[in-house]
Amino acid sequence: MLGRLMPREGKFFDLFNAHAARIVEGSRELSAMIGAFSELDAHAQRIDAIERAADKITHECITLLHKTFITPFDRDQIHQLITRMDDILDLIQDVAESVALYDLRRVTPEAKQLAEICQMCCERVRIVVGLLTNVRQADSILKTCGEIDRLESDADRVMRSALSKLFREESDLKQVMKLRVIYDLLETITDRCEDVANIVEGIVLENS
């Protein structure tokens, strides 16, 4: 059924793909920001611009949803998908603002690793969203969703290790609190990527 309905309203997939491209762009900018730990304000401003562009795409998608009689799949799934995708960029923006404003003395290897995992998750979000136009690629979609799930688990493990190390080695309570917020936001990005993967899995399994 999904294959028969998709050609009637391809605009949704254009919007999903455009938003996913912004997600990857934002994640790369964030990874570069944390990796180099320099020009923080400039990185944060670029991420703000990316997030604003993504917000416009989200608004356009929701407006289209209200105006379209035949949708490529369930309306609630469309709304959930674009909303969760937008959540990813909102969190990327939150991390960038926190890093720029918190006056951190340093960025830890664990924060860099989490940012890299976030970028890998976001790149796979773009892949699964791009594959949604063809349900015959269900195996590839589900495989990539599984990769997102594994990356989210990796982020959980890195965060637990990072917090343990932070509490053992950092004597400045303010720095502990600031880094903990950064870690939590980064890990939550991977949670939202996993949410997207779960939504996509549901779409594929229900319509293939």
Predicted regions and their residues:
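Cytosolic, long alpha-helical scaffolding segments
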Residues: 1-208
